[in-house]
Amino acid sequence: RDFAVMQQAQTITIQSTDEAKTLETLAYVWSALQKGGATRHSLLVNLGGGMVTDLGGFAASTFKRGMAYINVPTTLLSQVDASVGGKTGINFGGLKNEIGVFNCAQSVILSSMFLRTLDRENLLSGYAEMLKHGLLSTTENWAELLNFDITEPDYDILLGLVAKSVS
């Protein structure tokens, strides 16, 4: 909240588990937006992993018939998958991503700062998705991915590989 424009920002906190990717959590976000006076001209910033960017993007896409949103993905998997491509949605009726829309974020902000906080499981999960992308990419990019040491990551190099993965 160091920026003047952010002084009026409202924080909406939700559980970031797949079990919370529900209509109830969505209604909570809609209610918070409504109580906070959000309009179609407001901006929702989704800071978190894939569950947060999926649900937040869907909330923004459907509140007041659509408002702008920005994704700031904090996991490697969300940086290379969930936060790009406009996929938004919630789980419903026991099915994953059963209700949603495609609506791209105004911007996606990638930072290696978040990647430095991840445990091994989260790094490997995102790296596996990058390898899938690499199979469809150039032989040079594929070689870079295979040569990257995910067990001792250089986060600046990793962020460059993320950028290639989402391009």
Each predicted region: which residue ranges?
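Oxyanion-binding "anion nests"
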Residues: 146-167
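Active-site and donor-binding regions of nucleotide-sugar-utilizing enzymes
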Residues: 38-70
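Conserved strand-to-helix beginnings and helix N-cap segments that scaffold or border functional pockets
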Residues: 23-26, 56-57, 121
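A glycine/threonine-rich phosphate-anchoring loop and its flanking beta-alpha core
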Residues: 58-153
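Residue-level detector of flexible, active-site-proximal loop/helix-junction positions
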Residues: 16-18, 51, 76
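Amphipathic, well-packed alpha-helical segments that form the structural scaffold of globular domains
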Residues: 30, 128, 163-167
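ATP/NTP phosphate-donor binding region
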Residues: 1-43
